[in-house]
Amino acid sequence: MSIEVGSKLQGKITGITNFGAFVELPGGSTGLVHISEVADNYVKDINDHLKVGDQVEVKVINVEKDGKIGLSIKKAKDRPQARPRNDFRPKESFEQKMNKFLKDSEDRLSSLKRNTESKRGGRGARRG
């Protein structure tokens, strides 16, 4: 059986290592699912996700000249397309942004002055 990049196949886990899992494909060939291609989240221990003998669906991601087959479990899963968000907000004009910035900076500056003056004990007067 010819194995083509991009095809989805059913396979059986035949071996697990610390860097991935070996999968026997239809036709007797074996490919490797790298640990980074097992799940969408971080996989610290592959044994938490796979066991020898498990049936898995894999996607062929590469076939090298020396016959090595790279597989992915996470790319074989059909994920629903993310819908584009419809966050339409009218753009603020430059003047609106500038007015908002000036108001915010005035508020911050006045509160900073208030806090500084209260720590000094009033309008800069020193205590005797």
Curated annotation (Swiss-Prot):
Residues 72-128 are annotated as: Disordered. One of its GO terms (molecular function) is nucleic acid binding. InterPro entries: NA-bd_OB-fold, Ribos_protein_bS1-like, S1_domain. Residues 6-74 form the S1 motif domain. Residues 78-120 have a biased composition (Basic and acidic residues). PROSITE patterns: S1. Transmembrane segments: none annotated. SMART domains: S1 (SM00316). PANTHER family: 30S RIBOSOMAL PROTEIN S1. Belongs to the peptidase U57 family. This is Uncharacterized protein YabR. The gene is yabR.
